[in-house]
């Protein structure tokens, strides 16, 4: 190849998604088992009538729906459409946030392990990733504060954390945000927030209103079941939203994805009720794994984390032999999606047999 590419890209691996194996049970990508509601399907079908036209690049109708949805849940006037940005999945917004804050010589802090895309996107931008080890499978916020330097531009807090399934205590998160210098962007990545229960539900939108340097990311891929359409959003200060628009790939949020997201917002109560089924299965799977002898942190997501260390690859290999596709993370552990009950039963049968083997 004769084209001159950026030499630093040679050392940056491509993102590796969960595998899809025909005929196997895929519990590797944290997808919901529920398909779109009839009303969402109808909106998608209607949107196909206009596929010869470009989508709304300003996604105005979707932003208005999101603002109204937030008003309904947080109180009138919580956020305006000007405080909402839409992206091709929240992962694209992660990249945009890095682009508007960080370049060569700058630093971006995040926990490790956390979302695997963070270090790849940071390095692609030419910035330096600063990985702060987890403590008890969750963010060590004190250590993250200690990692801040005069080169820090952005901090990601993946909450619930992917892949370890844990959440940060809401009061601790509030103290953390208050302690971060106001010129540093704090991005709270809440792809799995709809699966949090009890007193661990974060008040992240309140943090956005109180602190102009805080951004909350949400997605329609998980609880809303639109992973195949790639659409997510950010809630932030209007100046940050304006900056995000400058690095947005034009028309990347398609007409179909916008229509599906709007219909999903209209059906939010019905869609989010489905998460109760997932949570019930999560609790059942967690209890069964612990009873079988596994050690795992309490999950507040639609997946569980098995910190298997040096036994990780053996677990993954043997699972594949049993037509189960799980997600390995080096020799740290395995992430397992909560699926349909019969799929969870198949996984539990394998897991019980595996842990009893030498």
UniProtKB/Swiss-Prot annotation:
Record PTM N6-(pyridoxal phosphate)lysine, positions in chain: 222
Keyword Mitochondrion: no
MF (Gene Ontology): aromatic-amino-acid transaminase activity; histidinol-phosphate transaminase activity; pyridoxal phosphate binding
EC supergroup of this enzyme: transferase
Biological role: Aminotransferase that catalyzes the conversion of aromatic amino acids and 2-oxoglutarate into corresponding aromatic oxo acids and L-glutamate.
Keyword Transferase assigned: yes
EC id: 2.6.1.57
Entry protein name: Aromatic amino acid aminotransferase
Co-factor(s): pyridoxal 5'-phosphate
Organism annotation: Mycobacterium sp. (strain JLS)
CDD domains given in the database record: AAT_like
Family indicated by similarity: Belongs to the class-II pyridoxal-phosphate-dependent aminotransferase family.
């Amino acid at each position: 190849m004769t084209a001159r590419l950026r030499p630093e890209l040679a050392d940056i691996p491509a993102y590796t998604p969960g595998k899809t194996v025909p005929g196997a049970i895929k519990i590797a990508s944290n997808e919901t088992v529920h398909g779109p509601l009839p009303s969402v399907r109808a909106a998608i079908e209607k949107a196909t009538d206009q596929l010869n036209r470009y989508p709304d690049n300003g996604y105005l109708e979707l932003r208005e729906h999101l603002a109204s949805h937030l008003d309904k849940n947080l109180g009138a006037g919580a956020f305006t459409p000007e405080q909402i940005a839409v992206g091709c999945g929240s992962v694209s917004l992660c990249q945009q946030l890095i682009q508007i804050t960080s370049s060569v010589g700058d630093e971006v802090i995040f926990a490790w392990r956390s979302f695997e895309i963070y270090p790849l996107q940071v390095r692609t931008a030419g910035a330096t990733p600063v990985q702060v080890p987890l403590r008890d499978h969750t963010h060590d916020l004190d250590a993250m504060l200690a990692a801040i330097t005069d080169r820090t531009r952005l901090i990601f807090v993946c909450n619930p954390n992917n892949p370890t399934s844990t959440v940060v205590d809401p009061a601790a998160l509030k103290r953390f945000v208050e302690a971060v210098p106001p010129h540093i962007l704090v991005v709270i990545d809440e792809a799995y927030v709809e699966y949090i229960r009890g007193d661990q539900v974060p008040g992240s939108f309140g943090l956005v209103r109180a602190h102009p340097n805080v951004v909350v990311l949400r997605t329609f891929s998980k609880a809303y079941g639109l992973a195949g359409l790639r659409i997510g959003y950010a809630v932030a200060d209007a100046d940050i939203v304006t900056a995000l628009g400058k690095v947005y790939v034009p028309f990347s949020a398609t007409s179909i994805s916008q229509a599906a997201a709007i219909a999903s917002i209209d059906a939010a109560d019905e869609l989010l009720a489905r998460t109760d089924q997932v949570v019930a299965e999560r609790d059942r799977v967690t209890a069964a794994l612990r009873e079988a002898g596994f050690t795992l942190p309490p999950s507040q997501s639609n997946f569980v984390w098995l910190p298997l260390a040096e036994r990780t690859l053996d677990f993954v290999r043997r699972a594949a032999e049993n037509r189960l596709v799980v997600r390995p993370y080096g020799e740290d552990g395995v992430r397992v999606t909560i699926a349909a009950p019969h799929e969870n039963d198949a996984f539990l049968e394998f897991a019980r047999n595996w842990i009893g083997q030498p």
